[in-house]
Amino acid sequence: LFNEKTVKYIPIHYVLSRYPSXGLNYYQHRLAALINNQFMPYPYYAKPVAVRPHAQIPQWQFLPNIHPPTVAHHPHPRPSFIAIPPKKTQDKTVIPIINTIATAEPTLIPTTEPIVNTVVTPEASSEFITSTPETTTVQVTSPVV
């Protein structure tokens, strides 16, 4: 099925004549196209080679870039890479400068531990006396419906 079939080469002037936006040019200008455009083989072309069984695959050759494209494609940065400047406030308030290099001092958190009485009276024994808060129990009766 694939014996003796040649690979067709589309000349660049034919591609330019198909698009009326290019106009009539005396020079061989290339259109700015995407790399993955399947309809315009921009810097690569296939050599016309007869395809036979066990034949070598046609090699892709690089065309010399005599006429560079007129449109330069710049990469579009993603929103995560764009630096947004802070908003300027209308009123001129002085912002106090906070020293971020200073060491952070730990804040003391009050704990709810029982208070230990360490005062020793001569009449008392040598044991520590712990005072616990007094609790009162109140019986709550719910009305039965």
From Swiss-Prot:
GO terms for cellular component: extracellular space
Coiled-coil parts of chain: none
GO BP term, example: protein stabilization
Domain of life of the native organism: Eukaryota
Pfam families named among the record's database cross-references: Casein_kappa
Keyword field contains Membrane: no
Alphabetical UniProt keywords: Glycoprotein, Milk protein, Phosphoprotein, Secreted
Annotated positions for site Cleavage: F81, I82
UniProt-listed InterPro entries: Casein_kappa
Modified residues (Phosphoserine): S125, S142
Tissue: Mammary gland specific. Secreted in milk.
Carbohydrate-modified residues: T107, T112, T118, S125, T141
Compartmental location: Secreted
Protein family per UniProt: Belongs to the kappa-casein family.
Function noted in UniProt: Kappa-casein stabilizes micelle formation, preventing casein precipitation in milk.
Name the record gives this protein: Kappa-casein
Organism (species): Balaenoptera physalus (Fin whale)
